[in-house]
A protein has these predicted regions:
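Beta->alpha turn/N-cap motifs
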Residues: 133, 150-155, 187-188
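Hinge/lid segment of periplasmic solute-binding proteins
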Residues: 1-32, 83, 174-188, 193-196
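Short helix-initiation/N-cap motifs at beta->coil->alpha
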Residues: 53-57, 128-141
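Extracytoplasmic/periplasmic substrate-recognition and gating elements
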Residues: 44-45, 121-127, 166-201
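Sec-exported extracytoplasmic/periplasmic mature domains
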Residues: 39-40, 47, 61-68, 92-96, ...
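Extracytoplasmic "Venus flytrap"/periplasmic binding protein-like
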Residues: 1-9, 40-51, 146-147, 157, ...
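Glycine-centered hinge/linker elements that transmit conformational signals in sensory
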Residues: 60-62, 101-130, 181-183, 187
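Extracytoplasmic/periplasmic solute-binding protein
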Residues: 15-28, 33, 55-104, 111, ...
């Protein structure tokens, strides 16, 4: 860590690796959840970028037109880790965390209710069934979803750079059409946490 330079690392990553006055390892990678959205549709509808619960709800109301276009594809498969990641991202964005420095945290009733109501809204704008990362990526890549929450691992696929998961918005598996119509948000804000936050691993 010292050879690479302390200033080349985020403080949070160094804190996680700290042990007995030194570092147990070198933090080498990490990722967060992103709101991936169709910027072309947002621009055409005059919608704000979806960086808050309110902006996402407004976009769902404007763009949800199933089966051609779903406003969102949110994970609903409760035994799939992806749903836990997305739900925790949504919780943290509203200042809700099940843990604190002392262990388990008491959940704030108002903020938690806001989280659950918001999650219900995005689930209601999703296709029916048990959904997880696979369906959200497939629907977005087919041009049938206005928004999803996904990790940065989707970015190379979105650009047509991964043969096993190509965009299907047109007949060219290496097409960058969808990438050119997409933008991402890294920090989401809820009504009880206007500064926003994000889940990270």
């Amino acid at each position: 860590v010292e050879n690479l330079g302390m200033d080349t690392f985020q403080a949070g990553a160094l804190n996680m690796a700290a042990f007995d006055g030194s570092y147990a390892g070198v933090p080498v990678d990490g990722w967060t959840q992103l709101v991936v959205y169709r910027s072309d549709l947002f621009d055409a509808a005059g919608l704000a970028a979806p960086d808050s619960y309110a902006d996402i709800v407004a976009a769902v109301e404007a763009l949800h037109n199933p089966p051609e276009m779903f406003g969102f594809v949110a994970p609903t498969k409760v035994d799939e880790g992806f749903m836990s990641q997305v739900l925790e991202h949504v919780m943290l964005s509203n200042g809700v965390s099940p843990v604190n420095n002392d262990g388990l945290a008491q959940l704030d009733e108002t903020a938690t209710t806001e989280v659950l109501e918001f999650y219900k809204t995005i689930v209601d704008a999703s296709p029916e069934g048990e959904l997880y990362w696979k369906q959200s990526r497939e629907m977005y890549f087919a041009g049938q979803a206005a928004m999803i929450i996904w990790s940065p691992f989707i970015l190379d696929e979105l650009a047509g750079l991964r043969d096993s998961a190509p965009p299907t918005i047109n007949d060219d598996p290496q097409s960058r059409e969808l990438a050119s119509k997409t933008a991402v948000i890294t920090t989401l804000a809820g009504p009880s946490n206007p500064d926003g936050a994000a889940w990270a691993d």
